[in-house]
Amino acid sequence: MSRPLRLEFLDALYHVTSRGDRREDIYHDDDDRQTWLNVLARVCKRCNWSVQAYCMMDNHYHLLVQTPDANLSAGMRQLNGVYTQLANPTHGRVGHVFQGRFKAILVDEDNYLVRSPI
């Protein structure tokens, strides 16, 4: 059975999270964190995203991202895919870095993030 398509909207604001496979660490050191930030910057430029906030935990991350062009899935595929391609050889790994699909919640209230535990 195929996955349901994600609904994406023009100029939407999303709270996005993605976790490490088997809840393992995504970032092992500051070089990994910088690599991920560099990939995120390239995705923002390519997809015309605006990141309002981010939080990098050892085994997952949170993004608050605005997508003027309704292209969240394409950008997330790029972000997680390119980071995986760069991180795996560095750490002698193959396979998944991230667990399943990213989670995205459409932010439609001013106080959404205030109520969101991290």
Predicted regions and their residues:
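Short catalytic/metal-binding and nucleic-acid-binding patches
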Residues: 1-118
